[in-house]
Design a protein with these regions (language model features):
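Metal-dependent active-site segment of extracytoplasmic phospho-/sulfohydrolases and closely related
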Residues: 282-314
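Short, hydrophobic/amphipathic alpha-helical packing segments
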Residues: 91-95, 155-166, 242-250, 283-295
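Active-site His/acidic residue clusters
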Residues: 69-77, 121-141, 224, 246-295
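Anion-binding catalytic surfaces of enzymes that hydrolyze or transfer phosphate/sulfate esters
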Residues: 193-282
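Glycine-rich, mobile lid/loop segments that gate access to catalytic sites or pores
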Residues: 81-187, 191-193
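Active-site nucleophile/metal-coordination loop of metallo-enzymes that catalyze phosphate/sulfate
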Residues: 1-104
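Conserved mixed alpha/beta catalytic, RNA-binding, or beta-rich assembly cores of soluble enzyme
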Residues: 15, 70-92, 114, 136-149, ...
């Protein structure tokens, strides 16, 4: 019924010359020009986990990944970019060990959610060559995707050293016993400096709220001065708390918020994993467990409204 009575069309969320990704695309959807304000993915995620970046700091996304067991690091294969969707509790134990063994006055590691974490480099550079996103090379030998830039060499060394530190970590020993993918290496990418986003309300004349499970979206919201409520059970995957996130959006409207940016990562995550059936299922659950509830509220609240449904990057 919604599609039947709606205006349907296409739009470009990633401008020519920019790498397609959730960071650039969501900034565009929110009305920001990434060509002007985008400084990298990880600084936005860092804001979400409470990392206060100095102007000279460079932040990088630090994935916990599963690599195969070849002796040479370059010969290993990217088995799993998310280490079997590792739990946040397990991942924090991994990152705590990495920080203890590899952290110092220059490198500081911070735990995020599930496999998504952060490295901050003091007085760092963003001129690192091609720091390949791990989800782009699933099933491939990693050697040709390691940056050959001289500036990136210390970071590649951290990745190599992390494998030796983590291959027999207690968390991984237990995951091995259970037949689960191990978080046996870190993978660094998404470098950038602290962003400067114009306040969303000052820019648009309306207040905003971002409801999302992932640090990237929450970080954009924080940097833009928007509300970013925490939702219990929000995982960023197909098992997320669809109803809880929808209710958080409704609660924001009840508090007087003008615009709610309700974001669901599940279809994108299923796509990265090659799970076509789960991607369809995720979209169907957004339809049945999110839109139905939200439209019931909007139709009964007595206010005029507009609703936009779209992917961030097709």
């Amino acid at each position: 019924a919604l599609a039947k009575n709606a205006e349907v069309g296409m739009c470009r969320t990633v401008a020519a010359g920019l790498k397609p990704g959730s960071d650039v695309a969501n900034l565009s959807v929110m009305g920001y020009d990434p060509a002007v304000c985008y400084t990298g993915r990880s600084p936005l995620e860092a804001a979400s986990i409470g990392v206060d970046l100095k102007p000279t700091d460079v932040a990088l996304r630090c994935n916990t990944v599963t690599l195969s067991g070849e002796e040479s690091y370059e010969d290993k294969t990217m088995v799993d970019y998310c280490a079997g969707d590792i739990s946040t509790e397990e991942a924090h134990q991994i990152i705590e060990t990495v920080e203890k063994e590899l952290g110092n006055d220059i490198y500081k590691f911070y735990g995020g959610v599930s496999y998504r974490h952060c490295l901050v480099v003091d007085n760092g550079t963003t001129d690192l060559g091609n720091m390949t996103p791990p989800h782009d090379i699933s099933g491939r030998v990693i050697g040709e995707y390691l940056s050959k830039s001289e500036n990136a060499a210390p970071l590649i060394d951290l990745m190599k050293r992390s494998y030796e530190i983590l291959k027999n970590h207690p968390v991984n020993i237990e995951r091995r016993k259970k037949g689960l993918h191990e978080a046996n290496s870190i993978w660094l990418w998404g470098e950038g400096r602290r962003p400067q986003l114009e306040n969303f309300k000052e820019k648009n004349g309306v207040s905003g709220c971002v409801v999302s499970a992932v640090d990237l979206l929450k970080g954009i919201g924080i940097c833009a001065g928007m509300e970013t409520p925490e939702v219990e059970g929000a995982t960023g995957y197909i098992d997320t708390n669809f109803e809880g996130k929808t209710q958080a959006g409704i609660d924001a409207f009840k508090r007087g918020t003008d615009l709610v940016y309700l974001h669901f990562e599940a279809p994108d995550e299923c796509g990265h994993r090659g799970e076509a059936q789960n991607k369809v299922k995720a979209i169907e659950m957004i339809d049945s467990r999110v839109l139905t509830k939200m439209l019931d509220y909007l139709n009964g609240c007595g206010d005029d409204y507009r609703i936009l449904i779209m992917p961030d990057h097709p």
